Amino acid sequence: MSELLLELFSEEIPAFMQKNAEKGYLNVFTKIFEENKIFAKVKVFVGPRRITLHATHLPKVTLPKDTAIKGPSLNASEAAINGFCKAHNVSKLELFTKLINNQLYYFFIKKTEEREIKEILPEIIIEAINKYSWTKSMFWGDYNIKWVRPLRNILCIFDGEILPMQFGHLTANNITYGHRLTDNKKIEVENFEDYKNKLSENHVILERTKREEIIKAGLLELANSHDLTIKEDNRLIEEVSGLTEFPVVLLGRIPLKFLELPKEVLISSMRRHQKYFCLFDKAGNFAPYFLFVSNGRFVNAELVIKGNEKVLAARLADALYFYKQDIAKTLESNLSKLLAVTFHVKLGNLREKVDRITNICNYIAPNNKDLIMAAKLCKSDLVSEMVGEFPDLQGIMGYYYAKHDGLDEEVATAIKDHYKPQGLSDNVPNGNAALLATADKIDSLVGLMIAGEAPTGSGDPYALRRQALGIIRIIIENKLELNLNDLINFSINLYKDSSDKNKDLIISFLKERIKFYFKNNYDISLINAVLDLSAEDLVSVSLKLNTLQKFLAEDAGKQLLNAYKRASNIIGDQKITGLVDGNLFTTQSEKELFAVMQKILPQIIDSITDKDYERVLNLLSSLLAPITSFFGNVLVNDPDPKIVQNRLSLLQNTCELFHKIAKFNRL
């Protein structure tokens, strides 16, 4: 069995693309090998400047392969059939037919003789390199090849020998390179073991997972040695492992004067911008230290530490300056600046948006002074110096500035949390923050839909799907008593150019997002049954789904559903009009069914008002016996058309009782 070693050596590959490339190239090479009847054990390694493939257990030769080649249909013209035969150098006698989608087609078997693996590997490798699709890629120079970053070298060795291969301007060789900063020299290798060892000797750790383990261990060791703690941050560890070929963890100091900054500013400056790790004391307070990952072990580590301390100090000095500039003003004084910030070219400026949000909040919770104050100031930090420099701190800085202005904690928290949730994994806000978040998201959703920014299959630039899901989650998880239709109507009326068409579009869009929210926990037919009755009260929708799912899973629920379906099937699409007339009953079963209906109707209405859907289903269950008796003893058809109509009305009214909780005809 043979071994293949391939290294694509390039300029720096973006860290966030590396893990996907590792998985992607593994899948691509594995699939292409299998398609060519080459069964090998494949591994892929990725780092800042290289993607490496190691394949073992390759055969020396390929297996003979028979491939069925599809031709024209049996009804095709003689010229088309002859053309197919000529193109593939076969006679018509060699063709056979095969049925595909009720249509017969001509086929022939193309036989591929066994070939030496090394003869076909170059074309397979080039196909695989091109087949993986990077998130972003580029051309460079005059070369007609496209990759994530300019390729500088290709190493390709098969069974200890260079595999003759040309990719664009590059010819395969047996050369790799060591660490960019400390050992950037040509290194000749013979096989994978030699390759891996020589890279290690020249300060390159090939395996991504091993680099991550080294970083984790280094972080913990330094944190523990200073009696400090570090919060788990696997995403940042993964990112810095993609920036370093030989990671070494070092510790730097933060001047104490910068600790007066809000902790989120420190974290944003360090984590997001510098890729540094924050440290905390045992009480959870921010410590005046940070950890960072150096790309290599240098003789003068102190010089490296001083350099990183200097870079961080400069960034924090800017942040401290911005912070002091901002707290010299009040949030309220920033309101006039919002006039100069466009929300959307068709929807006006941010000050107008703030006014709409405030109106919606006043509609949702009249006389809630804290909520109205939070609504009025919720966007004021967007024009602050700090948020201008650190956009990810929107809302958070509003919280600190509100506290500095002497506003209540409830107001400050609402300003901070009103952007939540920012994804499925994010918690929803509560209290006034939940109401403010709902108002903000409703205004954005309604306004942007009116402006023609509805999501399409190819994009959702304003994240309206996420906004809608946020509204749904906030209402359900906070059990907010809000009528979604009324809320949309109110919001639409705050815009001058709106119409019923806009309302229908928005409600339809929200309904689809409601289905998306529930689809993982409930059958779509049950979701449709509940939503087709009403999607206005999301708390009720959630309670109904939960109650109905449990009920219909039981034997009693299944029996009641079957009884409903018997009644519903008899009515079908008929338009039944007229009241039930007790004087037209001719059987005891009719009388009993009608009596039970009249008895439970007011109780069902009261239970629905109280959202006691379990009681509603228990009341409906009392119809099972009389419905069963009706179908056992009564024929709907009768010589007297009045009696027929009355019986149909009785069944219609029976079904309508079920429809007070859900459209059972959708189940």
UniProtKB/Swiss-Prot annotation:
Keywords: Aminoacyl-tRNA synthetase, ATP-binding, Cytoplasm, Ligase, Nucleotide-binding, Protein biosynthesis. One of its GO terms (molecular function) is ATP binding. InterPro entries: DALR_anticod-bd, Gly-tRNA-synth_bsu, Gly-tRNA-synth_heterodimer. SMART domains: DALR_1. It is found in: Cytoplasm. This is Glycine--tRNA ligase beta subunit. GO terms for biological process: arginyl-tRNA aminoacylation; glycyl-tRNA aminoacylation. Pfam families: DALR_1, tRNA_synt_2f. It catalyses: tRNA(Gly) + glycine + ATP = glycyl-tRNA(Gly) + AMP + diphosphate. It comes from the Bacteria. It comes from Rickettsia canadensis (strain McKiel). The gene is glyS. NCBIfam families: glyS. Its EC number is 6.1.1.14. Tetramer of two alpha and two beta subunits. Belongs to the class-II aminoacyl-tRNA synthetase family. GO terms for cellular component: cytosol.
